[in-house]
Amino acid sequence: MGLKDKAFESAEKADELVKTLSLGGSITAATVCLNAATVCEAFDRPREALERYSEAKSIYEDFLPPGDARLGGLYNNMALACVSLKEYDQARELYQKAIKIMSALPGGKPETAITYLNLANVAEAQQGLENASEFITDCLQKAENLLLDESNALDGNYAFVCEKCAPTFEYYGWFMTAKEIKRRSDEIYERT
């Protein structure tokens, strides 16, 4: 059995457990939906992913405080599925919601930076590089400021985020920023 089959089997078992334990409509059920959606997205089934994310969203928005990090993560993941389906306006709206949440959280700067880079990518996909250049530059500047902020905890999460963001900065020609955040990432990994 390949990874894909195992992942979908695990998601189905989790869905069955939610039903067996009568957890439908709970935060736990929403998290199971979110995890199943992530499996769908990972294996190129964005339409199914978006349906499962929508299930999670309706529960999370009903039961979680508006600034809960889980909502921010959901909006980010849901936006990625929208991008895969070329539903760019919805993706941008979800990324903006994620930014509002993540930027208000303690230690949320790295995650907010990722979201700004995702917004830049959406703008390019929707409008083209030339037409979106001003918006992209603005997003890159915000992401750079957030990642280079001295208040960031220089931990494994920060290293991971920097490592993941560096290629996007390189893609847009921000080579010095890419080099600096990659250096920071490498230093943290070497220490641990």
Where are these regions (language model features)?
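Structural signature of alpha-solenoid helical repeat scaffolds
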Residues: L21-G24, F63-P66, G107, A153
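A detector of tandem-repeat and repeat-rich interaction/domain scaffolds
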Residues: P46-L50, I59-L64, E87-E93, A98-I101, ...
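TPR/TPR-like (Sel1-like) alpha-helical repeat modules
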Residues: E134-N145, E170-E190
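Conserved alpha-helical positions within TPR/SEL1-like repeat arrays
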Residues: I27-A42, A69-S84, P110-E124, G156-E170
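Amphipathic alpha-helical segments of tetratricopeptide repeats
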Residues: D15-T20, K57-D62, I99-A104, L140-D149, ...
